[in-house]
Amino acid sequence: MFNFNDKIVFDDKKYDVLTVGEMLVDMISTDYGDDFECDTYKKYFGGSPANIAINSKMLGINSIIVSSVGNDGLGKFLLKKLQEHHIEIKYVRQVDYSTSMVLVTKSKSSPTPIFYRDADYHIEYSDELKYLIENTKIVHFSSWPISRNPSRSTVEILIDECKKYDVLVCYDPNYHSMIWERGHDGREYIKSLIAKVDIIKPSEDDAERIFGKDTPENQLKKFLDLGAKLVILTLGKDGAIVSNGEETIRFNTLADEVVDTTGAGDAFWSGFYSGLIKGYTLKKSLELGFAVSAYKLRYVGAIVDLPDIDTIKSMYDLKKLR
């Protein structure tokens, strides 16, 4: 069981965090609104696992990503961004499909997306991926790679391999029915994965899409009843509730300014992982995650220039973190 006042002890391995999944272009409107009537959109680096890899690198931990992009201009744009942040690109395949893209309105709440998918789910299991699993402390994936094959089969193998090598497996169930193949809405499949991972972080919207509308406390219980070991249920402006099945803790939001919510969850994961890797307790790592997320909310786009951890701790009065 995950105890909030304990640290997670990792073996000494080359990589701190391995993210597996989508790299894509976020086209974000320059004006607020959920009706897509804006005439102007700006191109941003995107994809939850990719965002986490970059954010984590900026926070001082060694991250790596396995993904696939198109052999096109947008794919080159994404690869260049990884290189700018000193992340190895040799595990990102360029495939003969168009780079995936999401059209999204700039939003102060949950943004409304339109998905254009092609290259992102062409991730295949390989000896290289097996090597990375053996040599990393934490593996992260989202619902995008499990929504279609071949990447779904790849993640299934990945989960089994992680168990062999004592790798912490974390899952972001960012469920959208539109990203799943026709005739497969994915909810039952997601439910079948919950007991197989170590940590899961649904948003309130994710929980509603998976289980239907309910109170946060009941949603939390549904994840736990399906075998979740640690559930981090984020509630937007209402903070978050986190439970290991025995103890439940509520965290208030640290956000003092909200410009754009795109990538806020990814920023949380990045801060949380950084805390775990640096030897903070589980509770203190959660607090750091919420602080990094609050900082990101001040800016448009999923990737922002994050300051170092000491600066974040000072900004959000987390000086006692350790």
Swiss-Prot record:
Q: Which cysteines bridge via disulfide bonds? A: none
Reactions catalysed: beta-D-fructose 6-phosphate + ATP = beta-D-fructose 1,6-bisphosphate + ADP + H(+)
Which InterPro entries does its entry note?
Answer: Carboh/pur_kinase_PfkB_CS, PfkB_Carbo_kinase, PfkB_dom, Ribo/fructo_kinase, Ribokinase-like
Spell out the molecular function terms from Gene Ontology: 6-phosphofructokinase activity; ATP binding; fructokinase activity
| Example GO biological process | fructose metabolic process
- The positions annotated for binding ATP are K201, T234, G239
Keyword check for Signal: no
| Entry keywords, A to Z | ATP-binding, Carbohydrate metabolism, Kinase, Nucleotide-binding, Transferase
Q: Which domain of life is it from?
A: Bacteria
Say if the entry is tagged with keyword ATP-binding: yes
EC annotation from Swiss-Prot or TrEMBL? 2.7.1.11
User: Which enzyme class, named as a word?
Assistant: transferase
Function in brief: Catalyzes the ATP-dependent phosphorylation of D-fructose 6-phosphate to fructose 1,6-bisphosphate. Together with the adjacently encoded sucrose 6'-phosphate phosphorylase, may be involved in a new pathway for the degradation of sucrose. Cannot phosphorylate D-fructose.
Q: Which family does it belong to?
A: Belongs to the carbohydrate kinase PfkB family.
In Swiss-Prot or TrEMBL terms, this protein is called ATP-dependent 6-phosphofructokinase
